[in-house]
Amino acid sequence: MTKPIVAIVGRPNVGKSTIFNRIVGERVSIVEDTPGVTRDRIYSSGEWLTHDFNIIDTGGIEIGDAPFQTQIRAQAEIAIDEADVIIFMVNVREGLTQSDEMVAQILYKSKKPVVLAVNKVDNMEMRTDVYDFYSLGFGEPYPISGSHGLGLGDLLDAVVSHFGEEEEDPYDEDTIRLSIIGRPNVGKSSLVNAILGEDRVIVSNVAGTTRDAIDTEYSYDGQDYVLIDTAGMRKKGKVYESTEKYSVLRALKAIERSNVVLVVIDAEQGIIEQDKRVAGYAHEQGKAVVIVVNKWDTVEKDSKTMKKFEDEVRKEFQFLDYAQIAFVSAKERTRLRTLFPYINEASENHKKRVQSSTLNEVVTDAISMNPTPTDKGRRLNVFYATQVAIEPPTFVVFVNDVELMHFSYKRYLENQIRAAFGFEGTPIHIIARKRN
């Protein structure tokens, strides 16, 4: 199920990042007063009343050295392409500007719902200035103050009123939904072609040349799959096609729709920081993961080469210690059969449930082998544990004091649960909760 996407659009320094942070409830973008300083995360989850949605701060998407007006135009186009509802932000202190009118002209053509937010309305006297923005043609402007959190409720009421009915999932629940992610030119398109056995995706050697892709259904050895091909993250002919953050946005959307994510790395080039960033998105969303080392045919090998490379992967991707590693050559179509058992096992474990009685036996044994920690004379008491969710498997451990559950002991319990039940290919989450 894909959540609606809300994009915040506006010229620099109208307060997009401040509102973004208010809506998602945490400071995930760096905010300064100088135009163009938004960094870090541009995509997060929000909720209002009974509605869950994803939200984009387009100010975080930089278009290289493109001219100022081109940047604003590109950000508006990204919002039009990706969003279900657009929040168009202006700034009451600076009034209506030529840049605001330029963004409005682009948004008129979008045929997407646009909610006009007038920011920095920090007191009642400033509300009369809001009416100047009616001339933009988007109906009632909503006065808000990002710095004080005023007016956000009315703004979000207007935003969620444009959400349609939730779409039914078109695929059977036994169908494994696969997304394929990785930095440009690691061979994502070639891997899709190798799996499908046909040249469905146009492939060239220039990073970022793959056109938009659609879902493709596929069966192998009695199991149905849907490939959500994220190799087509970048749209050709657009000014923003070269921005890494835009391609990340497209990948995040695909990851959200997946059960299992194939993280593709290039055996020839080795592992770089961008690989870890891309893989981190799948981990953060709690998806099952298989690491695919592609272009294995290009590496000179002896009997120890694979083990050495695997050790390197484990060292660089410590947060993915649960993921299995497949070595393949998409171009030569070799070793692809090793992929599917890993995919199937990861998917199965992502949905695995364990009985509470068996789980508590494992936890009790773990505590007897390694007693719970103490802090200032107080010992952590673990009363019982239960599984509360799947995809990913999530366990609640009821304790006397949550503060006494140190990260290291939680990690120890996770390792013991994994040793008992497997869970290869999937993250598991452990939540400490105080017993009432």
Curated annotation (Swiss-Prot):
UniProt entry tagged with the keyword Cell inner membrane: no
Pfam family, one: KH_dom-like
GO-annotated biological processes: ribosome biogenesis
Domain EngA-type G: 4-167, 176-351
Keyword terms of this UniProt record: GTP-binding, Nucleotide-binding, Repeat, Ribosome biogenesis
Domain KH-like intervals: 352-436
Amino acids binding GTP 1: 10-17, 57-61, 119-122
Family annotation (InterPro entries): G_ENGA, GTP-bd, GTPase_Der, KH_dom-like, KH_dom-like_a/b, P-loop_NTPase, Small_GTP-bd
Entry's family note: Belongs to the TRAFAC class TrmE-Era-EngA-EngB-Septin-like GTPase superfamily. EngA (Der) GTPase family.
NCBIfam families (alphabetical): GTPase_EngA, small_GTP
Name under which the protein is recorded: GTPase Der
Source organism: Staphylococcus aureus (strain NCTC 8325 / PS 47)
Organism classification: Bacteria, Bacillati, Bacillota, Bacilli, Bacillales
Gene: der
